[in-house]
Amino acid sequence: MRKYLNYLVVIFLISSCASESETQTQIIETTSTTASTTSSSTSTTIQDVKEDISYDEFGIELLDVTPEMKEQFDELIEFVEKKTGLSFVEYPKFNLYTLDGYRDYNAASYLDDFDKDYEEGEWERAVLSQNMWGLNNSSPEELKELIVEFQRCASAGSYNLLDQILRVPIKRNQIKLNLWEQSIVVHELVHSLQGQIVDLSDWYTTMKESDDFMDYPGRRSVMEAQADLVQAYWEANLDPYDRQDMSSQRPNFRCSVSLPTYFYIPFDLYYDFGGRLGKQIH
């Protein structure tokens, strides 16, 4: 299962976005009446309304950033820089999805990585070996589907170590980001800043080439500690009403999918010990 864990290390693999245009046909009824009160004529005019929609490399829709959202991003970037004492080298890259789109991206990017990592028959042999050792009784396809479903619901936002893009799900047709979305953006902006200050892409590539990820959990916990701390600072500025409002805006991120116990992912280290360590350092 090392290859699957490696996928979790990088968070998500390389992605890009492309723009396409979709044309919607709109029917407009127009009525014209002649000078005579006894006769009238009705005509139908067909107009083509073009709507530009952006997609990522998996064909998943990307939501547009409104001018108001751009202002919010600018303010959040300034906040992150102030709290960390560091400055962004360049404007951070980000993709905004609907919640379903974000989950579809997580699944699609994992499957894309899966197809690249496993040679024909390799996955089946690995699962058969697990069956023989009594680790699980799932078929290769069943275990693969379980992992895909876990990927779909396992995160509220993400930052990619390789392409340096942060990805956050938001509600469609919003003018501004709500409080919950802003809080997630703050957390991921810290990771984006970390990626600009430290060459995390090279760090990951070196680990993968040497097949040695022993240092990853400790470093990841420190990275999460800093992101959690800055996020907590931002939320501390909210009054009780806003806190309640933010809580109500939180999507249902409950993940009912559980991976087999031998898929050890030290979330307690990342989000518990790391946070306590960060507070002690601070």
Language model features by range: what are they?
Residues C153, L166-V186, G218:
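Short pre-active-site segment immediately N-terminal to the catalytic Zn-binding motif
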Residues T23-Q47:
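Extracellular mucin-like PTS domains
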Residues A236-H282:
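Long, well-structured alpha-helical subdomains associated
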Residues L76, Q196-Q249:
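Post-HExxH zinc-binding segment in Zn-dependent metallohydrolases
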